[in-house]
Amino acid sequence: MCVVIWLTHGRRTIPRRSATWACPGVLGSTLVLQDWTIGAYGSDEAGLICGYLFEAGAAQPVRAVDSSQAAEWLARTPVQERAGAERAYMWLHFNLSHAQAERWLMRHAGLSDVFYETLKDGLHSTRIERADDSLIAVINDVHFEFSFEPSDISTLWISVGPRLVVTARSQPLRSVDALRTAVKAGDAPKSSTELLEHLMRAQADVLVKIVRDGTARIDSIEDELLAGRLDHKRARLGTLRRVLVRLQRLLAPEPAALFRLLQTPPLWMSESDAQQLRAATEEFSVVLRDMGALQERIKLLQEEIAANVNEDNNRSLFVLTVVTVLALPINITAGLFGMNVGGIPLAEHKHGFWILVGIVVTFTAVAAWLAFRKKR
């Protein structure tokens, strides 16, 4: 008896290699056992999430490709590729959570070693720098369900060359999804640099929305503060400020690297592409200035709330102090005259009780006058 176990992932089965085995007890029978590779969700067996070939002069300017088609196209020399399409380039988007993604890139993409070093260096600040004849970019973006939590920020690594653009991420990001939607709608970037510029503008649009949502939240808190309904939950402002600070730290491009890049761009980058990249960088600067202004508003609100909390605490302490001062004369008098010893004054006096009441009232009035005079 032979048992064949088929491994599936979702509704797909992906064969990798096969081996032939003889079934014992069955004459002339063979068993073909397939070794299946289970890919990560949303990507193929190479970790490729999506791939597009852009050929400006072809009948089909934009064509979706899989990892095998991409490897075949990349194996061509630039001369062979230019004979088929004058300005063709390819965009490949990989899932770094897939074990085969980096191996496939090393085997077929021919990327600079700086790109792989950037994947492992642990530095996630936004930057664009030149490595050999390509551009290496690190862009930070937000997840689809951004809820103003620091964990909702993730990183996109990019390698840009004249024929190939590679983007890689560990978690789904909005900017890549916006680019995929634009490509499917027919808005295809004309060059690899324009694709990078499109990603940067998409990220800037996301930041604008974050600033807008953050402004709405702060406006609501300000209205509550002015109306006297604020519950003093400064944790909301603290979380929002931490997220904005982290966003600004991660998203602010490194000016020195950008300056060097724009001053001496690669030879394959056209002047118009360099100008568009410079314009996208300026958009980033505007959004980051707005984000800095938003942080200042949050800081002022936190100071105002802290002042209100201190004022409430001082008021409560004053009330407790007044109560203590007012109760002090009667407590002292009751303590002295309540002792069960001989020689207590006014013990035999017929008006002794009222005399003590008068003394207590007098000292209480004097203590109250002193306390309220200090308050004024």
Residue ranges and their predicted role:
Residues 2-263, 269-270, 283-286, 293, ...:
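Peripheral, non-transmembrane regulatory/ligand-interaction domains of membrane transport proteins
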